[in-house]
Design a protein with these regions (language model features):
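Short, aromatic/basic amphipathic alpha-helical patches
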Residues: 11-18, 92-104, 133-138
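C-terminal helical subdomain
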Residues: 55-62, 113, 120-123, 135-175
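Catalytic loop of short-chain dehydrogenase/reductase
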Residues: 32-33, 40-59, 68-113, 122-128
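Canonical Rossmann dinucleotide-binding motif of NAD(H)/NADP(H)-dependent dehydrogenases/reductases
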Residues: 1-23
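Structural motif
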Residues: 25-27, 74
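Short, well-ordered coil/turn residues at beta-beta hairpins
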Residues: 29-35, 174
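Residues immediately C-terminal
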Residues: 178
Length: 179
């Protein structure tokens, strides 16, 4: 069964190519803009807040609504771990990622009684072009896994019937970078 993947960038394409499901599913890659860092929260403008936070958050809400209207049984929202740890010069991006994770929990509570699961997957910041030399590390230790980490397997499982008992959760899939 096909999985509808919304969002742009390399990660969304990797997920379109690799994620499959045995039930109607949607994957929402949050449009976190890691290309534009903000030197200081004090310098953040209304236009930047609108472009980096508000518009992408509206797209997450719309994608969740579309998935619900399409009777998706599994919904997965993908964010960077930067939201969980914060990131110097990436405050609006971190706020967007955390807002999306809170929305996941709320949707899971609302829709769970109808058999819909809603979860988040937090991946390495590089998938969103977030520069760790600017944001600072998300951990005080190096990653525990040395291979390149793909979230395809975790997201495929969350889109399956086998994951029916997991909802409202964030699964970290970053090779042990954020613990």
């Amino acid at each position: 069964m096909s999985v509808k993947v919304s969002g742009g960038g390399v990660l969304a394409q990797v997920l379109r190519d690799g994620v499959h499901s045995d039930t109607t599913s949607a994957v929402i890659v949050v449009d976190v803009d890691g290309e534009h860092s903000i030197p200081s929260i004090a310098q953040l403008t209304d236009n930047q807040i609108d472009e980096i936070f508000e518009q992408p958050m509206q797209r997450v809400i719309a994608a969740l609504q579309e998935a619900h209207e399409a009777n998706c049984r599994r919904i997965v929202v993908v964010v960077p771990t930067t939201g969980m740890s914060g990131g110097a010069c990436y405050a609006p991006q971190a706020a967007l990622a955390e807002s999306a994770r809170i929305l996941v929990k709320s949707a899971a509570r609302q829709w769970g009684s109808t058999g819909i699961t809603v979860n988040a997957v937090a991946v390495e910041p590089h998938w969103f072009a977030i520069d760790p030399s600017i944001s600072g590390p998300v951990a005080i230790a190096p990653r525990s896994l040395s291979n390149e980490v793909s979230p395809v397997g975790v997201i495929t499982w969350l889109c399956s019937e086998a994951s029916q008992d997991v909802t409202g959760q964030t699964i970290v899939c970053d090779g042990g970078l954020w613990m």
